[in-house]
Amino acid sequence: MASRPYAQPRLKGAALAVLLALAATPAAAKCGNGAGGFENWLQDFKGRAASDGISKGTISSALGGIGYDSKVIQRDRNQHSFKLSFQEFYARRVSGSLISHGRGWINKNQALADRIEKRFGVPIEVVVAIWGLETNYGADRGQGFSIVQALATLAYDCRRADFFETQLMAVLGIIDRGDMSAGQLRGGWAGEIGQTQFLPAAYLKYAVDFDGNGRRDLVNSVPDVLASTANFLKAHGWSAGGGYQPGSSNFGVIAEWNKAQVYQRTIAVMAGQMK
């Protein structure tokens, strides 16, 4: 039976007051291009983190006391590495000692290398090349920034707010599950974590506990670092047994790690020299 039309009731008294109050409630705090609105934005984000299931303890320990970091914004506005030609980039970032170090590590750790190759189907020299290029085998991780504070600053900044808010929520998830503490999460200005520089969302999705201690530690555990890097490549379509030089399908998978063509070519060349 069709419903009968009915008259819209008029709002009176308290009901009207509630509606007007709701209309006057400020919208979610907006992004900004300076420090002025950061604290309001942060309070709003804490509420969203709680709604997303992050524990009160993690929100308090990770986000309490952080502030807007202008040095992060300066670094973000002054990126130049990937504007270089391949020859310029390779000459600046790769040395003979970087190659020999990687080759030597593979020779000395063949059992671990074989385990990673067998499990993920990715040649160890590709994984080690990424490790070497990203942080000089863990030696140059860039400990100058609080990763949580850097990500909060970039999430508040209007340039790529949605992307970095996703990364900030992910890093809270890493802390919440007990993989790392906020204090351990120090690194570069863009929020990458550990020895091969995982962004937090990728860390949550692809990190592997390969040393068997129950934690996925991409800062201190080399087995976890290399296995997680191989797992990322496998998950993005790496074809076991295939090549990785330009023109191959696996060369395209390297682009999922870093979109810069000079980076992809550098990894392929480095890996070829480590075999």
Kindly label every feature range from the protein language model.
Residues I54-K275:
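Catalytic glycan-binding domains that act on GlcNAc-containing polysaccharides
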Residues L16-L22, Q149:
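Hydrophobic alpha-helical targeting segments used for export or membrane insertion
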Residues A29-G36:
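Cleaved targeting-peptide boundary
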Residues G36-K56, S60:
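Mature N-terminal segment immediately following signal peptide/propeptide cleavage
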Residues A2-A15:
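Bacterial N-terminal signal peptides that target proteins for export
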Residues A24-P26:
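N-terminal signal peptide c-region/cleavage motif recognized by signal peptidases
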